[in-house]
Amino acid sequence: MITISDTAQAHFVKLLADQPEGTHIRVFVISPGTAQAECGVSYCPPDAAEADDVELPFNGFSAMVDEKSAPFLDDASIDFVTDQLGSQLTLKAPNAKMRKVSGDAPLVERIEYIIQSEINPQLASHGGNIMLVEITEAGVAVLQFGGGCNGCSQVDITLKDGIEKQLLDMFPTELTGVRDVTEHEHGEHSYA
């Protein structure tokens, strides 16, 4: 469920040494499954553990996860990174905003999951996003660009070299191509 690097585990052990005995960490998601989802880590004193918590044992401590957050923390990772600017704890939870779908889910759900969990976070750095409009009988994923991608001069490259390549690699037997149906209008909102 959650991977915690050796450096992060050592950091937690050091922090927990100054806490009352039996204190662990709690990893949680506020507003899981929504665009506003936020992840966090806090201390979990012994009297704060709930009966339905999932306990994940690590070296010298446990990570407690509440039942509601658990499915949204699949594939989550915590690391402790040190660089010339200092050190920081990083928590990555790719499924926090949208629950991971099973491999046998309908194609539309699996593509929508990839769009929301992998593609849109990349496009968000430019203020953009895409939406799946439909999948044609010929296996073409019809997409609509929004935000900073609408009217961007790089949209064709993003579509063909980025999104289409990624989706065809992931769904080689189910998709035959990707098509953009956006009526692009370059304006102040456009990234480039």
Swiss-Prot record:
Q: What is this protein called?
A: Fe/S biogenesis protein NfuA
Q: Which gene encodes it?
A: nfuA
One Pfam family named in its UniProt record: Fe-S_biosyn
The molecular function GO annotations come to: 4 iron, 4 sulfur cluster binding; iron ion binding
Q: What is the lineage of its organism?
A: Bacteria, Pseudomonadati, Pseudomonadota, Gammaproteobacteria, Alteromonadales
Q: Where does [4Fe-4S] cluster bind?
A: C149, C152
Assembly information from the UniProt record: Homodimer.
Query: What protein family does this chain belong to?
Result: Belongs to the NfuA family.
Keywords of this protein's UniProt record, alphabetized?
A: 4Fe-4S, Iron, Iron-sulfur, Metal-binding
Name the species this protein comes from: Shewanella frigidimarina (strain NCIMB 400)
- Record note on cofactor: Binds 1 [4Fe-4S] cluster per subunit. The cluster is presumably bound at the interface of two monomers.
What is this protein for, i.e. what is its function? Answer: Involved in iron-sulfur cluster biogenesis. Binds a 4Fe-4S cluster, can transfer this cluster to apoproteins, and thereby intervenes in the maturation of Fe/S proteins. Could also act as a scaffold/chaperone for damaged Fe/S proteins.
**HAMAP family attached here?**
Fe_S_biogen_NfuA
Biological processes, Gene Ontology terms: iron-sulfur cluster assembly; protein maturation
Looking up SUPFAM superfamilies in the UniProt record yields: Fe-S cluster assembly (FSCA) domain-like, HesB-like domain
* Superkingdom to which the source organism belongs: Bacteria
Matching entries from Gene3D superfamilies are given as: Fe-S cluster assembly (FSCA), HesB-like domain
* Listed cofactors: [4Fe-4S] cluster
